[in-house]
Amino acid sequence: MTTIAIIGLGNMGKGLAKRLAGKTDLVLASRDHAAATAFAATLPAGAVVLDQASAIAGADIVVLALPFEAALEAAGNPALKSKIVVDISNPVKADFSGLAIGHTTSAAEQLQAAAPDAKVVKAFNTIFAGLFDLPAAQTAAVPAFIAGNDEAAVAAVVELAVLAGFAVEKTGGIDAARLLEPLGMLNIRFGYGLGQGTGIAPNWIKLAA
C-alpha cells in the first residue's frame, strides 16, 4: 500500500487526511505534535504521527499542505530526493489581493527548483478546504487540476485525487501551474471577495464534441 505523508495540518491538510484515512498508509507531520496526535485519534482508521523528517523519509508521496513560503522552505529538505511531492499552494499576497508570483513562474516551479531531485506535482489548489468535509459523492465531479513533468508521478497523484473523492483534469507539465494558480486565486475571489462562499469549485463543461 502506498504511504502518503501529509506535512501540515491546517484546514487543507486535515481535510485531505479525512478523505484518505483507511484507504492508504497515512502519515501526518505538524509543528504541533500533540495537536496532530489528537487529530489522528479522530480518524476512523487512525494515522501515524511523526516529525517532518521521519514522515518524509518513509513516504512514497509527500503532500506539502502548507502556505507557499513554508512549502518552499520544506522543499529544501534533502530527504525529498526521488519523492513525489504534491504542491497544493497558491502564492497569494499577504492581503489576498492577488498572487505574489506568476506569468513566468509559479509556486510549483519554485518548489521544483528548490527540490530538483524530487518529482513535484501541482494538485488541489483550486479546491476549498470545506469541500473535503462533504460526502465524497458530492465532490465526485469536482476536478483536481493536476500538472507535473514526470508521467509516473502524475499518474500516482491522479490515483490519490480519485482516492480522495475527486475527478481529475490533467493539464500538462509543471509550467501549467502558471495557469492553475491564477485559477485558484479566481476561486478565492469568488468565494471570499464576491461572497459566493467556499462551497464552490471551478470545472470545465464540454458542450460539444
Question: In which residue ranges do the predicted regions lie?
Answer:
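General beta-strand structural signal in soluble alpha/beta enzymes
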Residues: 49, 119-124, 169-172
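Rossmann-fold NAD(P)-dependent oxidoreductase module
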Residues: 15, 19, 114, 160
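NAD(P)+-binding Rossmann beta1-loop-alpha1 motif at the extreme N-terminus of oxidoreductases
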Residues: 1-42
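Active-site-lining helix/loop region of Rossmann-like oxidoreductase modules
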Residues: 143-209
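Short, well-ordered coil/turn residues at beta-beta hairpins
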Residues: 65-66, 88, 123, 147
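Rossmann-fold NAD(P)-binding glycine/threonine-rich loop
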Residues: 89-136
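Rossmann-fold NAD(P) dinucleotide-binding segment
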Residues: 53-61, 68-95
